[in-house]
Amino acid sequence: MNLPPDALHENVYAFALARDQVESYCNQCLTSMAELKKCSACRRLAYCSQECQRADWKLHKVECKAIKTHNEVANDSIRLVMRIAGKLSRNEDGEIEAYYIPGVARNFQNLEHHPSSYDADEESFVKEYFQFAIAPHPDRDLIKLIFQKVSINSFVVGNSTGNPIGVGLCIKLSAANHSCKPLTRVCYRNRTAMLVPVSSELPSTLEGACHSYIDELMPRDMRRDTLKKKYKFLCQCDGCLDEDRNARMEAWTCGICVKGWMRNKENGQCELCGWTMSKDHFELCRTAEEAGIAARSRLANDAIPLETKRNLCEKLLDLFQDTLHDHNVHRIPVLRCLYICSLAAQNITAAAKTGGTLLSIMLVYQNTTDPAILFQKYQLAQLFCAAGAKTQATKLLQEIEEPLEKIYTPDSMICRNVYCMILKARNLS
């Protein structure tokens, strides 16, 4: 039986915008517009109308007092838990009933969670929560329970260009399982969350509308370690069981034909020319791989200056030359970091080159209609327009125009931007 059209859509049960986004989007409906009005009390959270501000007040009034007291906005996870506690105090558990929902009905109370006797992250969160919250406080065990459920059921909230702007919780859509080779991607039309199919293959059940809980463009062992630590399960999804795909993700470059790929093990053979890896080549490739793994934490460290990161990225890419295959996912964190560094330096040419290289790897493992691919092409098209490369920009924009219309509707901000860029590219000729 096919799912009804609205089965993979849901009005978010609760959400909280990131600190740096609370003044850029309406904190009730997630509309983005030039004229947002701030809350007259805390002067931090913004709204698109008085109607939205009144609708949000029952949740905002508790955090509003805390913001005024501390003269700062807490992080989005703390405020999301605070908002959910407010909803539960009014018996708003978000229950949804439908024949395709596991158990027919689903609400906050029956969301999965992983209770434990002691968890350092949980204890740290609870301590930080009560440092921000203003009395009267909810029960400490309730805050722990909400945190446990939010930790494994929440989604990143994004805007129509795929950029993260906060965190939210969906009651119905959180029933969808994980896959490292996802069938859907989480997208948003304002505060309506959607599980958007990444290809023509449509899920037949809500649980089977698998999306990736993590960045799936990592080696299998890293994916499994991440999932085990946060979600407490050993992943056995289609992506993890696809041996050829996983081997390609960590492939090394052939030392003879260069274009061929080899499994990252001693005596590996090139899948193209059949050459058996020499001991010297094995050591070179192993060194490059270990360097890429070791650099991940430094590349993700915001305290390290971008110029330092840029130099590290360039050295790593030199090391990866003729060792890690062009489609090896260990390249991705390096390329993402270098892309950000190039944008920060306003080096449009370098950013476009790096973004294009990143896209070529993504296309090996993700479908052309996957929103992740569409957003990457959208960013590249913006760079090509800025650089005056009309042919490249037009090609990308035409490829993403129709898929984005299906996801967001022709009147959405991202689609209007695409139309404007197409016109701009034509005027460049």
UniProtKB/Swiss-Prot annotation:
InterPro entries given in the database record: H3K4_H4K5_MeTrfase (IPR050869), SET_dom_sf (IPR046341), TPR-like_helical_dom_sf (IPR011990), Znf_MYND (IPR002893)
Key word Nucleotide-binding present: no
Positions with a binding annotation for Zn(2+) 1: C26, C29, C48, C52
Coiled coil: none
PROSITE patterns attached to this UniProt entry: ZF_MYND_1, ZF_MYND_2
Matching SUPFAM superfamilies: HIT/MYND zinc finger-like, SET domain
GO MF assignments: DNA binding; zinc ion binding
ZnF (MYND-type) ranges: 26-64
Positions bound to Zn(2+) 2: C39, C42, H60, C64
One Gene Ontology CC term in the entry: nucleus
Cellular localisation: Nucleus
Presence of keyword Zinc: yes
Disulfide bonding pattern of the chain: none
Keywords tagged on the record: DNA-binding, Metal-binding, Nucleus, Zinc, Zinc-finger
Pfam families: zf-MYND
PANTHER family linked: EG:BACR7C10.4 PROTEIN (PTHR12197:SF251), HISTONE-LYSINE N-METHYLTRANSFERASE SMYD (PTHR12197)
Protein name per the record: SET domain-containing protein 14
Organism (species): Caenorhabditis elegans
Annotated gene: set-14
